[in-house]
């Protein structure tokens, strides 16, 4: 498997695969997601994916020659789905404040309902937190830079260093909430999450970008 930071970078920058044009590939990755959620990503094998997909062995191996290819493609696809959900949330708000709240609700909802993320959070939350604790912090940096770009897009006059610091705080908060869900706000209640974002995250972003 390629390093996670590299996969996330591909998810952000590379041209997406048209899944409508290759339904077989989609079926394979859907099976891989179900299998990884059931047994864990580390224990998943290509043979497991073949069995769960219901496709022929050679059909699967023609598209993914080895296990790492399946894992890499799955991670990139799910990251793209996450970014698309967040982008859709950002597009829902009529104001930067509404957009921030909608994006936070969308991100937390994705994490809450995603089968593989839920398995990791339930069985090994330390793996999620390790992305923030890793020495090179590449994954955290990518998340921070993505958030910073969204903040800067709605607040072009904001101080760049302040925006980066604010984005770093939000990225760390999100990882913590995914790994160790809070009691308040209730991560299962979109209304609570939206109120939390408006009451706390929006002022933090405004103050942190020098516009509060």
PLM feature segments, named:
Residues 55-64:
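Short hydrophobic/aromatic patch on the recognition helix
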Residues 1-39, 43-52, 69:
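Basic, helix-initiating cap at the start of DNA-binding domains
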């Amino acid at each position: 498997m390629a390093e996670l930071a590299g996969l996330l970078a591909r998810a952000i920058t590379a041209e997406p695969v048209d899944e409508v044009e290759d339904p077989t590939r989609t079926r394979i990755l859907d099976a891989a997601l179900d299998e990884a959620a059931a047994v864990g990503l580390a224990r998943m094998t290509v043979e497991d994916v073949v069995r769960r997909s219901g496709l022929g062995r050679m059909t699967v191996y023609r598209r993914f020659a080895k296990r790492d290819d399946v894992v890499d493609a799955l991670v990139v696809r799910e990251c793209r789905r996450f970014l698309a959900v967040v982008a859709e949330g950002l597009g829902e708000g009529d104001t930067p404040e509404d957009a921030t709240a909608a994006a936070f609700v969308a991100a937390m909802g994705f994490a809450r309902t995603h089968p593989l993320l839920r398995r990791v959070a339930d069985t090994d939350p330390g793996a999620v937190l390790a992305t923030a604790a890793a020495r090179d912090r590449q994954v955290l940096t990518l998340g921070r830079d993505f958030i910073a770009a969204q903040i800067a897009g709605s607040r072009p006059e904001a101080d760049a260093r302040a925006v980066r610091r604010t984005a770093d705080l939000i990225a760390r908060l999100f990882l913590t909430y995914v790994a160790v869900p809070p009691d308040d706000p209730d991560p299962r209640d979109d209304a609570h999450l939206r109120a939390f974002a408006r009451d706390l995250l929006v002022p933090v972003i405004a103050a942190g970008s020098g516009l509060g």
